[in-house]
Amino acid sequence: MIKRYTLPEMGKIWTRENRFRKWLEVEMAVCEVQAERGEIPQKAWEHIKQKADFDIDRIDEIEAVVKHDVIAFLTSIAEKVGEDSRFIHQGMTSSDVLDTATSLQLKEAGMLILNKLERLRDILKKRAVEFKDTACIGRSHGIHAEPTTFGLKFALWYDEAGRNIDRLEKSIDSVSVGKISGAVGTFAHLDMEVEESACRKLGIKPAPVSTQIVQRDRHADYLSTLAIIGGLLEKIAVEIRHLQRTEVGEAAEFFSKGQKGSSAMPHKKNPITCERISGMARLLRSNLMTALENMALWHERDISHSSVERIILPDSNILLDYMLFKINDIVENLIVNPQKMLKNLQITRGLIFSQALLLALTRKNITREDAYSLVQKTAMKCWENNKNFKEMVDNDKDINQYLSKEEIDRCFNLTYQLRNVDNIFKRVGIL
């Protein structure tokens, strides 16, 4: 991933230095277990533990000749360890190192993402309570529908963030597995206890069964979860982008001192970070499709997944980490305009209460179809003539023969329409 979108802590997990360091951790965990079992002389193990290290420049030199990164890595270590290096990598295959180390990286990356996701949920909860009773127009198909509250938008996102936390915890657990089972997963030259003990030392679980690799449904599941979380962030970003439109003006990204919105138009304040998040969510979804393609490999393993994962695993984690960092800042500092929300509620001159009127009529021994026709007829006149819907209803003889003035007034009662907001908040777990 390019530097522009890489935060330091997440970026460090996916550096070459850390990648090789994780490889070394795996090799050392296996050697330690084998030494405990008497399979490596204790003196040799102490020497290995003291001397084992790698040199990235030297790895690159060796790989240029041997065309194999794990062999180059092991050769670099051997040059530092000397004769006792013969005990390193005993009974193992390259993917024992690669896949187990990748699991360690994914676990670390997943925990960083989880922390930011939990913070997002906390911010959403705070803002939901803040705007719980702030009335605004609800829209379907982009058209004014019925009143809602701005707090309910945050409550919806809060609830979804909770589901994503559950998903991510499960996906981290699923991908936190190692395999030290040899060339085709049969433990032909290793004892199964070596795998179990080494994985325990590394803080992960052994895969119950493996081939030459850990099966890629685990990685696909993990990237699926990242893409779904990205979908929530895009949902929030798209909503803010719509609400920031000039003709809507209900909410906007914070615009800092000295910030400029356009090279040509000095007046512009654009939702650029939300737009960036929308674009990044597309990348997350495209990476998921590639991860799904990696599941079906030849027999006990081919290498077609390897080149792909060198890109999609770092990039997806780095992207989502950055997206969460940005959306947290956006939501926490979101500029909200309740006055414009109130003004927008009045744009349709009362048409947003048409369903309440329809239902009131159906309770007066009139068919739903006839009631719908009565309300729609008046509503269309309101649209065409720019009239106030309630005033037209008050003077509509066809409607007045069924409903009293008090009954009509009740249909246009905003407070009554929003009477269940507190109950929704309680059900979500915010109140």
Regions found by a protein language model. Give the residues of each.
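Alpha-helix N-cap/helix-initiation motif
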Residues: R16, I113, F150, R218, ...
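Amphipathic alpha-helices that form helix-helix packing interfaces
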Residues: V33, I113, L117-L120, L124-R127, ...
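Alpha-helical support elements that line or immediately flank enzyme active sites
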Residues: E32, Q105-L117, L226, G230-K235, ...
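Acidic, glycine-rich loop-and-beta core segments that form the ion-binding/anion-interacting portion
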Residues: E195-L288
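Amphipathic alpha-helical coiled-coil segments and their boundaries
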Residues: D99, L106, G110, F154, ...
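A helix-coil-helix interface module used to build multimeric assemblies
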Residues: M1-F187, D191-S197, P206, Q259-S262, ...
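Short, well-ordered beta-strand elements within core beta-sheets of diverse protein domains
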Residues: L152, A220-I228, A356-K364
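Glycine-rich cofactor/substrate-binding loops
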Residues: M1-K22, I62-V66, E83, M265-L431
